[in-house]
């Protein structure tokens, strides 16, 4: 298993299927025989989510102490768009590391003491996302977490929602106007136009009828009513978007990534206060 440490760097967009090892970056923290994590919440999902969050809260001081020296960790769900997100973070001066979703366990991830987490887009469903679902549940309550496309779907499923085919079909490279409401609070869309233009690359969405409104709140939507962003009601630093902020179609996408980094910095300052 290997990770890639990234600083201010300009990354070329790789073709689909490139791995972190094939980019011109330094490899660090090599570990042998990583344990694969099986995520089991097709049944009793709400019970597992509640138990995982309670465990995360109880361990927040002893085993998952967050400090400013840790990186933002990107969980790559085998998607080339991950590197566009990385490029934005590099341009914004962010120190981060990238791991494929089967390169390390959640326990290994905790030991890295991340400042924040980004769950990338990817093919398939949240059940195909390796450690992403478990990461949302166990680390989401502790550090800022930003899910993009499949990352938002992982947030939705982790907290009890159902991921279904979009009633409007496949949206691949399509543009939409997105409206948002963060209730006057600073969030991912702070400073953006309302509505704003986004690029969409997905066929799945969080089902409207099963949306876990007791746990999550919708913060952005399309004109036809599909959920385009959500955040946790209690842990407002758990946020995700269905569209792609790194797409050239998304006119203010870099601002969204910058707002996530600001959220990480704000959370750190609160811990130090």
From Swiss-Prot:
Keywords attached to this entry: Amino-acid biosynthesis, Aromatic amino acid biosynthesis, Chloroplast, Glutamine amidotransferase, Lyase, Plastid, Transit peptide, Tryptophan biosynthesis
Organism the protein comes from: Arabidopsis thaliana (Mouse-ear cress)
Taxonomic lineage from the root: Eukaryota, Viridiplantae, Streptophyta, Embryophyta, Tracheophyta
Oligomer status and interactors: Heterotetramer consisting of two non-identical subunits: a beta subunit and a large alpha subunit.
EC number: 4.1.3.27
Gene Ontology molecular functions: anthranilate synthase activity
Domain Glutamine amidotransferase type-1: 71-270
Boundaries of the annotated transit peptide in chain numbering: 1-36
Domain of life according to the entry: Eukaryota
Subcellular location: Plastid, Chloroplast
GO biological process terms held by the UniProt record: L-tryptophan biosynthetic process
Name listed for the protein in its UniProt record: Anthranilate synthase beta subunit 2, chloroplastic
UniProt xrefs under Pfam families: GATase (PF00117)
Gene3D superfamilies, per database record: 3.40.50.880
Activity regulation, free text: Feedback inhibition by tryptophan.
Main localization (coarse): plastid
Gene that encodes the chain: ASB2
CDD domains associated with the record: GATase1_Anthranilate_Synthase
A single cellular component GO annotation: chloroplast
Annotated catalysed reactions: chorismate + L-glutamine = anthranilate + pyruvate + L-glutamate + H(+)
Residue positions of the active site: 149, 244, 246
NCBIfam families documented for this protein: trpG_papA
Job of this protein: Part of a heterotetrameric complex that catalyzes the two-step biosynthesis of anthranilate, an intermediate in the biosynthesis of L-tryptophan. In the first step, the glutamine-binding beta subunit of anthranilate synthase (AS) provides the glutamine amidotransferase activity which generates ammonia as a substrate that, along with chorismate, is used in the second step, catalyzed by the large alpha subunit of AS to produce anthranilate.
């Amino acid at each position: 298993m290997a990770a890639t440490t990234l600083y201010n760097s300009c990354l070329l967009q790789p073709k689909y299927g490139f791995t972190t090892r094939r980019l011109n970056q330094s490899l660090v923290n090599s570990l042998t025989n990583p344990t694969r994590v099986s995520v089991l919440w097709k049944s009793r999902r709400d019970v597992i989510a509640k138990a995982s969050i309670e465990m995360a809260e109880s361990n927040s001081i002893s085993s998952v102490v967050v400090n400013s020296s840790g990186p933002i960790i990107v969980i790559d769900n085998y998607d080339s768009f991950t590197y566009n997100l990385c490029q934005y973070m590099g341009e914004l001066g962010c120190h981060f590391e990238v791991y494929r979703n089967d390169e390390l366990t959640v326990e290994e991830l905790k030991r890295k003491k991340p400042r924040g987490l980004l769950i990338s887009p990817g093919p398939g469903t949240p059940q195909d996302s390796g450690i992403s679902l478990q990461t949302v549940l166990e680390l989401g309550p502790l550090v800022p977490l930003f899910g993009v496309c499949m990352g938002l779907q992982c947030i939705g499923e982790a907290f009890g929602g159902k991921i279904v085919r979009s009633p409007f079909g496949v949206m691949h490279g399509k543009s939409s106007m997105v409206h948002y409401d963060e209730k006057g609070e600073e969030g991912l869309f702070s400073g953006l136009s309302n509505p704003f233009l986004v690029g969409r690359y997905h066929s799945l969405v969080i089902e409207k009828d099963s949306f876990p409104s007791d746990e999550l709140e919708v913060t952005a939507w399309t004109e036809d009513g599909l959920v385009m962003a959500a955040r946790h009601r209690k842990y407002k630093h758990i946020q995700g978007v269905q569209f792609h902020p790194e797409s050239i179609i998304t006119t203010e996408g870099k601002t969204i990534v910058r707002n996530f980094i600001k959220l990480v910095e704000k959370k750190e300052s609160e811990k130090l206060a």
